[in-house]
From Swiss-Prot:
Interacts with RTN1 and YOP1; GTP binding is not required for these interactions. GTP binds at residues 44-51. It is an enzyme of class 3 (hydrolase). This is Protein SEY1. Residues 1-681, 727-776 are cytoplasmic. Its EC number is 3.6.5.-. Belongs to the TRAFAC class dynamin-like GTPase superfamily. GB1/RHD3 GTPase family. RHD3 subfamily. Pfam families: RHD3_GTPase, Sey1_3HB. The gene is SEY1. The chain crosses the membrane at residues 682-702, 706-726. Gene3D superfamilies: P-loop containing nucleotide triphosphate hydrolases. PANTHER family: PROTEIN SEY1. Changing residue 50 to A: Abolishes GTP binding. The lineage of its organism: Eukaryota, Fungi, Dikarya, Ascomycota, Saccharomycotina.
Length: 776
């Protein structure tokens, strides 16, 4: 037997025992049981032998009925007992867990009569706090609705879902159906199948809360079935059956072991007592558990059943009869009204016999379901209509006569037309009761049409900007490159004047006032101003890219060299110069260099003629945010400015001047070399003079035997070369020797002249720099 007497955990007045925790502590003593405990409840009809079963199975000491005296209620409220002793077929040597057994007051007792509130709350409490709920029933009760407590189980399942169904865990309860007085005529498997089917049917008919619509019975419960022989007529077999049942409570690791981890609430024992008390408080206070009378229950059940049948018939005929009519408003509305009226009429014919408030409540719910189902078809029709109307609007806008009808006028007329047709269709559905509220659809339609018109407006604007860009960008590039390739001191004034005039020419069609534009697509004044600003940004970026891409070091050197050569090589009338003296070359060199360097500073920094730096009047880039971003460093470690006017750095300017100086020096050298070539040319009369004056020497050579021998050798050599045609190789050898000699002489001469000229040039550059600084 149990080591301590049972206590009444919840009395018949529905009060929770306040000393429950002390009872648990007395049962376990000083042991720390942790999670190694289990809770079992028994549930069933009054006088069905629940307490007797618990006493035999768990060696508890619950009060039992003496059938020889009187059949009456014995267990009142919910009683709790502790045990570690389970009646089994074999002795278990290992330490057995602590088991707490709840004996629940029997249902359907005459003492409470029609008051079923407590038995339902007690059953719900047992499911909420137990790992295993033993449902005690007789074999002859199976197949009954009230007798085997199925009605009570349905209510408990429904309320259990509403209270505990949304918990995000995998906790389950084992429903252990103990079938008493099982004589074996009907197999246990057949009995279990019957009970399982009843439970599954009950579950599908439950009114499930939001979030649990798709839940299954097996998401919350596991089912087991055990048969016990008759206690009096088959006492030995009954005892043996109970022991076999006890094996499943103690033999861990076996397939039929009942205390599985997913059944445990994972709370320490003192936490479980608090949990149990809170559960009872919640169950006791929850209004959903103040259940209506049996008549209302029947009305709700039957009207729900009738409603579901009518709805199923409606759905079965819906798709087949509606599909061919989706494109025709008149036929579609007629068929929808017909189907809806047929469904409601069928419900009214059968459900109107029950309680009116329940009947009307379920009718309203059915009507809502019908409208919800129909709303999908209506939305589909309206969306299809919207697409058709939108296609018509786009076609009307694109095919308009642009000479007489503006984009804004065309869009406004089309919008008014499609809104009228759409609203007329929607009102048709509403008048026939197929559409309860059109506010949401109207708002969605308005938002949709505004969004689509915005897309149409954006496309029109993109096309306009594209046409402007197509003309503006190449014009700017051509004009700017032309002006920069032939620069003057006022080149930046010319560029800016051309810049403004090019922009103005390309958007003059949209100008309404000075600095005010209307791009004729229905935009506000601020939006038009923003577009104008974007066009200026485009123009400035084009100008910036063109200037900085064109004015590279090599290009600027080429421009300076061309200006130099225009003055150095040609006179004022454009004729080529013929140099006579070095002084003439040096004088032309100074004038040409000054002319070339006049635009050097102009090409290095973009400033107007009054020495004002050119600054864009719009942001050049989105990331532009002040001076912190104006200076950057390139891959070669050179610092640059992002400001538009800054074209060359000081280092780049030195590089340009160095390359320019080298190139013009070569030009000067070539000019001076032409004078030297002229001076070193030998006149023909010199050869005649040499022949007359050198006759005596010639005769002396002939008379000398050595000279004669040398002459013969040379003559023989000449003969052999001529005889065998070897003049080609000989000429090549001679030319190579002469060429090498000439190159060596030129290098020496150039070195001499360049050194002399660079000395003069350095002095002249210093004088030029000083003069420029004085002029500034």
């Amino acid at each position: 037997m149990a080591d301590r007497p049972a206590i009444q955990l919840i009395d018949e007045e529905k009060e929770f025992h306040q000393s429950a925790l002390q009872y648990f502590q007395q049962c376990i003593g000083n042991r720390d049981v942790g999670l190694d405990y289990h809770v079992i409840s028994v549930f069933g009809s009054q006088s069905s032998g629940k307490s007797t079963l618990l006493n035999v199975l768990f060696n508890t000491n619950f009060d039992t009925m003496d059938a020889q005296v009187k059949r009456q209620q014995t267990t009142k409220g919910i009683w709790l007992a502790h045990t570690k002793q389970v009646n089994t077929t074999i002795e278990i040597d290992n330490d057995r867990p602590d088991i707490f057994v709840l004996d629940v007051e029997g249902s359907d007792g005459s003492e409470r009569g029609e008051d079923q509130d407590f038995e339902r709350k007690a059953a719900l409490f047992a499911i909420a706090v137990s790992e295993v709920l033993i449902v005690n029933m007789w074999e002859q009760q199976i197949g009954l609705y009230q007798g085997n407590n199925m009605a009570l189980l349905k209510t408990v399942f429904e309320v259990n879902l509403s209270l505990f169904g949304k918990n995000d865990n995998d906790h389950k309860v084992l429903l252990l159906f103990v079938i008493r007085d099982h004589v074996g005529v009907t197999p246990l498997s057949s009995l279990s199948d019957s009970v399982t089917r009843e439970l599954e049917k009950i579950w599908t008919e439950l009114s499930k809360p939001a979030g649990c619509e798709g839940s299954s019975l097996y998401d919350y419960f596991d089912l087991k079935f055990v048969g016990l022989a008759h206690k009096l007529l088959q006492e030995d077999k009954f005892t043996q059956d109970v022991k076999k049942l006890g094996d499943s409570f103690v033999m861990k690791g076996t397939e039929n072991y009942y205390f599985k981890p997913q059944y445990h609430h994972r709370l320490p024992l003192d936490g479980w007592t608090m949990y149990a008390e809170n559960c009872w408080d919640q169950i006791e206070r929850n209004k959903d558990l103040d259940l209506p009378t049996q008549q209302i229950l029947v009305a709700r059940f039957k009207t729900e059943e009738i409603s579901n049948e009518a709805l199923e018939e409606f759905i079965s005929k819906y798709d087949e009869s509606i599909a061919p009519l989706k494109g025709n408003l008149g036929s579609l509305t007629s068929q929808l009204v017909k189907l809806k009226e047929e469904c409601l009429t069928k419900y009214d014919e059968q459900a109107s016999r029950y309680a009116r408030n329940v009947y009307m409540e379920k009718r309203e719910a059915l009507n809502t379901k019908l409208n919800s189902h129909i709303s999908g078809t209506i939305n589909e029709f309206l969306e299809s209509l919207m697409e058709k109307l939108w296609d018509d609007l786009k076609l009307e806008v694109s095919s308009r006569d642009k000479a007489t009808t503006s984009f804004v006028e065309s869009v406004a007329a089309g919008k008014s037309k499609i809104e009228k047709e759409f609203n007329e269709s929607m009102e048709t559905f509403k008048k026939l009761g197929l559409l309860i509220s059109n506010e949401e659809i109207t708002c969605k339609f308005s938002d949709d049409i505004e969004e689509r018109i915005k897309q149409l407006r954006d496309a029109e604007l993109k096309a306009k900007i594209g046409r402007i860009k197509k003309n503006l960008v190449p014009e700017l590039k051509d004009h700017v490159i032309h002006l920069l390739s032939h620069p003057s001191k006022k080149v930046w004034d010319d560029i800016m004047n051309d810049f403004e005039s090019t922009i103005k020419d390309n958007i003059s069609a949209y100008q309404v006032e000075k600095d005010k534009y209307d791009f004729k697509i229905g935009l506000s004044e601020s939006e038009n101003a923003k577009i104008y600003k974007n066009i200026r940004i485009l123009a400035w970026r084009t100008l910036d890219t063109t200037v900085h891409d064109y004015l590279k070091i090599d290009t600027i050197v080429s421009i300076l060299r061309d200006r130099f050569e225009d003055v150095f090589r040609y006179d004022a009338e454009g004729s080529p110069r013929l140099w006579k003296t070095e002084e003439e070359i040096d004088g032309a060199f100074r004038v040409a260099k000054e002319h070339a360097l006049e635009v050097f500073e102009v090409l290095s920094l973009a400033v107007t003629s009054d020495n004002v730096e050119i600054i864009p009047d719009v942001p050049m880039a989105e990331e532009e945010s002040g001076e912190d971003n104006e200076i950057y460093r390139d891959n070669e470690g050179v610092f640059h400015s992002r400001r538009f006017a800054h074209i060359l750095t000081e280092l780049q300017k030195e590089n340009v001047l160095d390359q320019f100086r080298r190139q013009i020096n070569i030009t000067v050298l070539d000019s001076k070399r032409s004078i030297i070539t002229t001076r070193t040319h030998i006149p023909p009369w010199i050869y005649v003079l040499l022949a007359v004056l050198g006759w005596n020497e010639f005769v002396a050579v002939i008379r000398n035997p050595l000279f004669v021998t040398l002459t013969l050798i040379l003559g023989a050599t000449f003969f052999v070369i001529h005889k065998f045609g070897l003049w080609g190789p000989v000429v090549n050898v001679v030319q190579s020797a002469v060429g090498e000699t000439r190159t060596a002489i030129k290098d020496k001469l150039r070195q001499f002249v360049v050194e002399d000229h660079e000395v003069k040039e350095s002095f002249e550059m210093k004088d030029f720099s000083k003069n420029e600084q004085k002029e500034k």
